[in-house]
Amino acid sequence: MIAGKPLVAWVVEAVKKATSLDDVIVATDDERIVAAVEQYGGKAVMTPSELPSGTDRIACAAGDFADDDILVNIQGDEPLIDPALIDALVAKLRDGAFEMATAVTPIKSAADLAAKTVVKVVLARDDAALYFSRAPIPCDRDREPDLASGLYVRHLGIYAYRGGFLKRYVKEPPCALERTEKLEQLRALWMGARIAVVRTADEGIGVDTPEDAARVERILLGRGA
């Protein structure tokens, strides 16, 4: 519980503020989460526990969807998710130039650049993703990385997909790059998909520890939640 409500209820409340979404559904393999969501007026569906990735779970939960539909995968541990970021990702997919969209934020420390838990992204000039890696990329051959250059960004765990591409994605087995880096988005690049990237200054706060929960609770209470 965070500030008197289940974590997932806070996430649903934040996501519903995005103006681009027609519906919000929680996909889970835990009946306790379904009960918590429904208690606070949300929608939730049970999905098989053996699904290989979050993307596969989204496709399963969505059921029948059209090729032109846009589906957004939002982590269930981020109650401070910015609704404007969700809307920005959806906007990137409106014209059909990209099959997926995601988000990045600047890397601010050498420790984060080196950490395998921080996923780095190299971008093209139109901010399309060229590659995702747990390694520190791009590698500056001649000097220490200039973190102020704008080249060094970390991936945030939010995705939007065009429906037609999502159908193709879940039919493909994990590729060698995905299995090596343990990054499901590499399957999309391996398939030849174009992934639009939205830059944001918001680093996001996932609730993974009691300390994270306490920090988020202070922020929510400070907002008058």
What are these regions (language model features)?
Residues L147-A225:
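Conserved alpha/beta core of the MobA/IspD/sugar-nucleotide pyrophosphorylase nucleotidyltransferase superfamily
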Residues V24-V26, L71, A101, A129, ...:
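Hydrophobic/aromatic residues located in beta-strands of well-ordered beta-sheets
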Residues I25, E31-I74, E78-A91:
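Short phosphate-binding loop-to-helix
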Residues T28-D29, I81, Y161, D208:
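A conserved hydrophobic position in a structured secondary element of the catalytic/binding core
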Residues L21, D67-D68, G96-E99, A193:
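Short, high-confidence coil segments that cap the C-terminus of an alpha-helix
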Residues M1-A27:
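N-terminal glycine-rich phosphate-binding loop and ensuing alpha1 helix
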Residues I81-C175:
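Conserved core of the sugar-phosphate nucleotidyltransferase
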